[in-house]
Amino acid sequence: MSDNDQLQQIAHLRREYTKGGLRRRDLPAEPLTLFERWLGQACDARLADPTAMVVATVDDKGQPYQRIVLLKHYDEKGLVFYTNLGSRKAHQIEHNPRISLLFPWHMLERQVMVTGKAERLSTLEVVRYFHSRPRDSQIGAWVSKQSSRISARGILESKFLELKQKFQQGEVPLPSFWGGFRVSIEQMEFWQGGEHRLHDRFLYQRDDGAWKIDRLAP
């Protein structure tokens, strides 16, 4: 198959979106109410990793980066995720805390995008979550100097076994280089696929302490 044939095959990959629309009259006043409803439906539909979200950050040269992390908590203060504080995303957030999140619920023909500002979680919040994780995950947090270059996977595996032996008694301590971020919600956009590419998009945006809702063209 030639490169041109392959490109033609990709160009023709499409499907109709038929799972229903989204109407203004059905929207709650608060975006988190709709987010919670959609997240619950994603869980009920047994989607793989329904809490997985794309986190987009920008470096000091304006280059954007994206990666998938798991949402671990949300409330009116924002959406929470955890990471190695030496990671590329953590350094980029330190330089520019304005970030974007995206929940891609393809099987439900939905996506939710959040824009806002990330801020570090308190040590108490981080400690509570860290000790709720499986023990091997706690040890794994110690192993990796995230985003650094390594020569082989065996280095990580050997370090994991070494630390598992070291921490076999008592609690695994919280690494000083591990923490979390809360992303405030300045905007939240809900997208529902529609027939003939007439998708439904609604944007919630803060306006003098209240939420303004606008329909956007697809």
UniProtKB/Swiss-Prot annotation:
Reaction catalyzed: pyridoxamine 5'-phosphate + O2 + H2O = pyridoxal 5'-phosphate + H2O2 + NH4(+); pyridoxine 5'-phosphate + O2 = pyridoxal 5'-phosphate + H2O2
Named cofactor requirement(s): FMN
Key words, A-Z: Flavoprotein, FMN, Oxidoreductase, Pyridoxine biosynthesis
Binding positions (substrate): R14, R15, E16, Y17, K72, Y129, R133, S137, R197, L198, H199
Protein name: Pyridoxine/pyridoxamine 5'-phosphate oxidase
Pathway membership: Cofactor metabolism; pyridoxal 5'-phosphate salvage; pyridoxal 5'-phosphate from pyridoxamine 5'-phosphate: step 1/1; Cofactor metabolism; pyridoxal 5'-phosphate salvage; pyridoxal 5'-phosphate from pyridoxine 5'-phosphate: step 1/1
Organism: Salmonella typhimurium (strain LT2 / SGSC1412 / ATCC 700720)
Quaternary context: Homodimer.
